[in-house]
Design a protein with these regions (language model features):
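Short, solvent-exposed loop/turn segments at secondary-structure junctions
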Residues: 31-34, 52-54, 96-98
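PTP/DSP superfamily signal
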Residues: 80-88, 105-156
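Short, amphipathic alpha-helical segments
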Residues: 69, 98-101, 119-123
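Glycine-rich, flexible N-terminal cofactor/catalytic loop recognition
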Residues: 1-49
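Generic beta-sheet signal
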Residues: 24-26, 87-91
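Short, glycine/charged-enriched secondary-structure capping and boundary segments
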Residues: 40-43, 104-108
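Helix-loop module immediately N-terminal to the HCX5R catalytic loop
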Residues: 47-89
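A phosphate-binding catalytic loop at a beta-strand-loop-alpha-helix junction
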Residues: 89-105
Length: 156
């Protein structure tokens, strides 16, 4: 079963990620006009996208800084292509926890094996890609008060 891993841009030239092998894909997410890191490992396919880490409820000055529906559709197509061809996938963004995490999470939903990494998926990226797959996506609501109660063993 192919796997998918999210990581930070700085991890790519240092190879601080699993070696994806010869049948592999690298998806690079950068800010517009951002630096594209050169990978230390070889990848069969490399794909680059530019969009900011903007959530659905953010208000950017330029809406074109959001991930577009066209980009989401292409990302889903690439993940399906990689999965169908049993390609391991490494996906990076600047910090490796939001944009790349959303893409990795969608890949796991498609069927990729998970490589344990911290993820805080970008909700807009998740919503658009899940819609392209025809799957529902609800923004998770996190109950910090309940977590605190459990952590402290206290009752409010």
């Amino acid at each position: 079963m192919p796997w998918i891993e999210n990581c930070a841009a700085d991890d790519i030239p240092r190879a601080y990620h699993h070696d994806a092998g010869p049948n592999s894909m690298l998806i690079q997410i950068t800010d517009p006009a951002g630096t594209i890191p050169s990978p230390r490992h070889l990848f069969k396919e490399k794909h680059h996208f530019e969009f900011l880490d903007i959530e659905d409820d953010d208000q950017p000055d330029d809406p074109e800084m959001f991930i577009s529906e066209t980009q989401a559709k292409e990302l889903v197509r690439l993940l399906k292509h990689a999965y169908d061809n049993r390609m391991n996938v490494v996906v990076h963004c600047y910090a490796g926890v939001s944009r790349s995490a959303a893409i990795a999470q969608v890949g796991i939903n498609i069927g990729f094996d998970e490589v344990e990494k911290f993820r805080s998926p970008n909700t807009r990226v998740m919503r658009l890609m899940m819609a392209e797959l025809g799957l529902p996506y609800e923004v998770p609501h996190h109950n910090w008060r309940e977590d605190y109660r459990k952590y402290m063993g206290a009752k409010f």
